[in-house]
């Protein structure tokens, strides 16, 4: 059981999230894709978001914009990045993905070319008790981010979802599935020419993350 468990749990890799083949990963290609780009990570201070930031720090990006509503976790992330990645050009931004004005401010000021959208409420029991907040953040927040990405010409938008969105049986899973449907519908509308834009949307589902905190 221990060996099986070890094989199933591994670190988040940027190359997995960017839609590359799982076999024969070309890290040089990933580096070329991100080189000189401004990258925005929402939920940057959460478990998955912060790990994405750490992974991005190893690539030759132009700037990393870390966006999160949680002040203390963001402060801790800032201290870590400053200590471990001294050459990394990053900016911590406090804000809520549910706020169109704040999101527009971020896109208008930094013009990210790649977005990793990890901001979400994810704890199942809490969301059962607070369904409206799950919908506001996971669905409406995703819509605000996706629409802004298209408006500002983002090249790639990676939505971090959950395996609980598969045949969802709880509020959290339903909210993430709705967010997936919106992103997929927007992507299809762009392909059909119904919405003007060139943003490529990718959805990546995660299972439970060990030692996770809020996203």
Language-model features: locations:
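Short, small-residue-biased leader/transition segments that mark boundaries at the very start
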Residues: 1-5
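N-terminal Rossmann/SDR dinucleotide-binding element
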Residues: 7-111
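SDR active-site strand-loop-helix element
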Residues: 42, 67, 115-119, 157-162, ...
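A short helix->loop->beta-strand "cap" motif at the edges of active sites that frequently abuts
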Residues: 61-62, 152-156, 198
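Hydrophobic/aromatic anchor residues within beta-strands of the central parallel beta-sheet
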Residues: 92, 134, 201-204
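Conserved Rossmann-fold NAD(P)-dependent oxidoreductase catalytic core, especially the SDR/UDP-sugar
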Residues: 117, 121-181, 185, 191
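Conserved beta-loop-beta element that borders a ligand/cofactor-binding pocket
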Residues: 183-211
């Amino acid at each position: 059981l221990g060996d099986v468990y070890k094989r199933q749990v591994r670190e988040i890799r940027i190359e997995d999230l960017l839609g590359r083949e799982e076999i024969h990963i070309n890290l040089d290609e990933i580096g070329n894709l991100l080189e000189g780009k401004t990258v925005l990570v929402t939920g940057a201070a959460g478990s998955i978001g912060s790990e994405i930031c750490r992974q991005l720090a190893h690539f030759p990006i132009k700037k990393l914009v870390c966006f999160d509503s949680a002040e203390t976790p963001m402060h801790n992330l800032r201290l870590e990045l400053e200590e471990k990645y001294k050459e990394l050009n990053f900016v911590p931004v406090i804000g809520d993905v549910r706020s169109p004005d704040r999101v527009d401010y971020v896109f208008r000021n930094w013009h990210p070319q790649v977005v990793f959208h990890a901001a979400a409420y994810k704890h199942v029991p809490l969301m059962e008790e607070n369904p409206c907040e799950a919908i506001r953040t996971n669905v409406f927040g995703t819509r605000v981010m996706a629409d802004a990405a298209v408006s500002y010409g983002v090249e790639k938008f990676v939505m971090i979802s959950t395996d609980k969105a598969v045949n969802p049986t709880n509020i959290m899973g339903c909210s993430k599935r709705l967010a997936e449907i919106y992103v997929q519908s927007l992507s299809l509308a762009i392909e059909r020419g119904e919405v003007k834009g060139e943003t490529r949307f990718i959805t990546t589902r995660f299972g439970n993350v060990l030692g996770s905190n809020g996203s």
